[in-house]
Amino acid sequence: EAGHTVDVIGPKEGETYVGKHGYPQKAELSAKDAKAKNYDLVIIPGGTSPDHMRRSEHMVAFVREAVKLKKPLAAICHGPWMLCSTDVLKGTRATSYMSIVDDVRNAGANWVDEACVVDSKSGRSTVITSRTPDDLGAFMKAILSLIETGSAQGTKGKPVAPGWVK
């Protein structure tokens, strides 16, 4: 809708992956063949796909290459699971779906209950994270702003985590 080119990268080129709501998505390129240097930003989807993605050595290697090149990264819902496998979360502010709060914290992030968090410390990848599909508007606003202007702002939103998540 915003006029940007998007490539769907998966463990295997041509493989169709079906999300938890039944929507199919075909990988246009394998992670083994994809080069992070060719992309302005890497978006990691939510749902259970990041759990499968992080089991692929080539998917992890692609995201690690993006981190090394200081490419911006965006992850929503369970997407930060993939970031946990790359060391990019160390020292960042980040958010995620509440069931992976401990994973995000164990990866070194300061987890916060905000709709969209943008961590853009100098000298490293900008990391954009969001909690749930309800935060998709704030998530995409931050991504598009970063692509189009070079900077982005987070959105606090209403807290959604239960009291035991502190």
What is each of the regions a protein language model found here?
Residues Y97:
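Active-site-adjacent substrate-recognition loops and nearby beta-strands
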